[in-house]
Regions:
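Active-site cofactor/cluster-binding pocket
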Residues: 1-194
């Protein structure tokens, strides 16, 4: 998937505490490292951990002059599949755009779930069991880390090398080298997934 607009726009749907803001920050910093212009910002209220959140990212080769929330995304990333029960995450996505979902469900099952809530989506759907991969490799449910690899694979908006470098830069001192290496392995596994 390549840019088809001047500004590549992403919406992350998650629940508080799932790391959508951290994932957006890593993508944004990777883009900056590649010489691109970016914006990354969350939208949430005073809710506590577990409440639905949105995080927006914009990437461009030119200066970004808008500051509104993203309304016409190129990619939607869903870190918690239960959000599909309450949000029409495919609103304003067209057939050239992509939906990445952390789930064990098949593409057909995701389409059925969307249809239950009156949503039709004819673009590409990329399911990935980010929780499963994270539990297997990291030993904790960290879907935001795994989803980075799938995001890079699907969009090519930033390189895998840049994402890994930024992850290491941001988190190695915080979580230690061993945990950092496991997270990077999880990112790479998602990137290599079908």
């Amino acid at each position: 998937m390549k840019y088809h607009k001047d500004i590549f726009e992403i919406i992350f749907y998650a629940r508080g505490g799932q790391g959508a803001k951290a994932a957006a920050e890593i993508i944004a910093q990777a883009a900056v490292a590649e010489g691109k212009f970016v914006q990354a910002f969350p939208q949430f209220g005073p809710e506590r951990s577990g409440a639905p959140t949105k995080t927006f990212v914009r990437i461009s080769e030119k200066a970004i002059r808008t500051y509104e929330p993203v309304i016409d995304p190129d990619v939607v990333v869903v870190l918690d599949e239960t959000i599909l029960d309450s949000e029409v995450v495919t609103k304003n996505l067209d057939s050239q755009e992509a939906l990445i979902v952390n789930t064990k469900k098949t593409i057909h099952e995701i389409q059925q779930k969307l249809a239950e809530h009156g949503a039709r989506f004819e673009g590409k759907i990329y399911p990935i069991d980010a929780n499963g991969i994270s539990m297997e490799i990291v030993g904790q449910p960290r879907p935001n880390t795994v989803i980075l690899g799938k995001f890079v694979q699907v969009t090519e908006a930033v390189s895998l090398a840049s994402v890994i470098a930024e992850f290491k830069h941001i988190f190695e001192d915080k979580i230690g080298k061993e945990a950092n290496d496991k997270n990077i392995l999880a990112i790479e596994k998602a990137y290599d997934s079908i």
